[in-house]
C-alpha cells in the first residue's frame, strides 16, 4: 500500500544567505547520535551537492543538536517498512535559507532501502531542516514526469537496527496518526570526514535572555 507523501517541513525563512558551499569529499559521512545508538550516513556530495551542502550546514552549525526524530510512517500492509522523519521540525530559530530541489531525475539517486532524503511541504523548493530515512524501497518518492518527488542525497552506512526500532515505536496524534508519542532525541549530528564549514549565521536558540530585575 502506498504511503502518504505529505512530509512535514519547517516554517519560517532565515534572513541571511550563507557563503557559497565549499568543496566536499565525494561522500561525506555523518553520525547521528540517539539514545538507541548511532546512525552513520554517507552523503553523496558528488551527485546531490546542493542538498548535501544544506544538510551539512545544519550539522556544522549544530542546528540538529538536541532535536528529535518525531515521525514514524509505517506501511499499513507491511508495518516493518516505511520511513522515520527527524530534524528541527518547526523551530524557525534554526532554519537555514531554502534551496532549489535536486530531484532524483537530476541526481540519478533513488529511494531505495536506507535512503536519506529531504522532507518538504507541497512546494518543490520548500525543503529545509527536516529529513527522512527509508526502511524498504520507496520508488513512489522518486521524480516521475511532472511529479518532482523528494531529494534523496545519501544512504545509511550503519545503524539500520536503530532506525527500525524508531519506526516500530507507538504513534498517534497529527500527521495521520504518525507522530511519535515519545519523540526520540537527536543528541548530536557530527561529520566524520571532510572539514566542517559553519555557515556563520546567527544561532538564536543559543542566546540566553537575562531575567529582568524585580522592581
Task: Mark where each language-model region is.
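Cyclophilin-like peptidyl-prolyl cis-trans isomerases
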Residues: 16-215
Amino acid at each position: 500500500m502506498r504511503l502518504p507523501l505529505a512530509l512535514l517541513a519547517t516554517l519560517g525563512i532565515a534572513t541571511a544567505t550563507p557563503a557559497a558551499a565549499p568543496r566536499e569529499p565525494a561522500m561525506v559521512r555523518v553520525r547521528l547520535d540517539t539514545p538507541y545508538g548511532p546512525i552513520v550516513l554517507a552523503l553523496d556530495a558528488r551527485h546531490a551537492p546542493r542538498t548535501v551542502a544544506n544538510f551539512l550546514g545544519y550539522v556544522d552549525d549544530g542546528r540538529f543538536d538536541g532535536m528529535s526524530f518525531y515521525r514514524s510512517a509505517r506501511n499499513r500492509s507491511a508495518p516493518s517498512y516505511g520511513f522515520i522523519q527527524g530534524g528541527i521540525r518547526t523551530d524557525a530559530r534554526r532554519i537555514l535559507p531554502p534551496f532549489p530541489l535536486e530531484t532524483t531525475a537530476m541526481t540519478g539517486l533513488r529511494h531505495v532501502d536506507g535512503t536519506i532524503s529531504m522532507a518538504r511541504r507541497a512546494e518543490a523548493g520548500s525543503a529545509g531542516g527536516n529529513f527522512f530515512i527509508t526502511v524498504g524501497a520507496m520508488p513512489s518518492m522518486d521524480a516521475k514526469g511532472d511529479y518532482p518527488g523528494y531529494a534523496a542525497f545519501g544512504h545509511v552506512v550503519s545503524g539500520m537496527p536503530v532506525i527500525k526500532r524508531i519506526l516500530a515505536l507507538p504513534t498517534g496524534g497529527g500527521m495521520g496518526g504518525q507522530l511519535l508519542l515519545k519523540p526520540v532525541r537527536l543528541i548530536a549530528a557530527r561529520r566524520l570526514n571532510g572539514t566542517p564549514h559553519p555557515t556563520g549565521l546567527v544561532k538564536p536558540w543559543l542566546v540566553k535572555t537575562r531575567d529582568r530585575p524585580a522592581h
